[in-house]
A protein has these predicted regions:
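Intrinsically disordered, low-complexity serine/threonine- and proline-rich regulatory segments
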Residues: 1-10, 92
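N-terminal helix-turn-helix DNA-binding core of bacterial DNA-binding proteins
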Residues: 6-49
Length: 111
């Protein structure tokens, strides 16, 4: 993808959980930047999207947060994936892989 696109519907939780699983503790801005970096700039993830998702994931018990200092010594909330979050990540990854396989078969099918 050359142009920026919004993150595909239904993948935000998956990408946030995966980012925290790989990177460890990160603040919200760092999570968003890391997702954009891995997507090589092809996804746009605005802060109005990431913070409600982080709150929702924390309420579900899939992540935890604590206050700390960012790289520029500003106060920031840092997030970490929980054991329940790792289980959810595994389930969502499996579901996403099944969905991709089905859509791929449908797109490649010729009568």
């Amino acid at each position: 993808m050359d142009a920026e696109a919004d993150i595909p519907y239904g993948t935000l939780d998956l990408t946030v959980l995966k980012t925290l699983d790989v990177m460890g503790s990160l603040h919200g801005y760092g999570i968003g930047r890391r997702i954009e970096q891995v997507a090589e700039g092809s996804l746009a993830l605005n802060q109005g999207t990431i913070y409600p998702a982080l709150l929702r994931l924390e309420q579900k018990g899939w992540i935890t947060s604590k206050w700390g200092a960012s790289e520029n010594n500003r106060r920031a909330r840092f997030y970490e994936i929980t054991r329940a979050g790792k289980k959810q990540l595994a389930a969502e990854t499996e579901s996403w892989q099944r969905t991709v396989a089905i859509v791929t078969r449908l797109l490649e099918h010729e009568p």
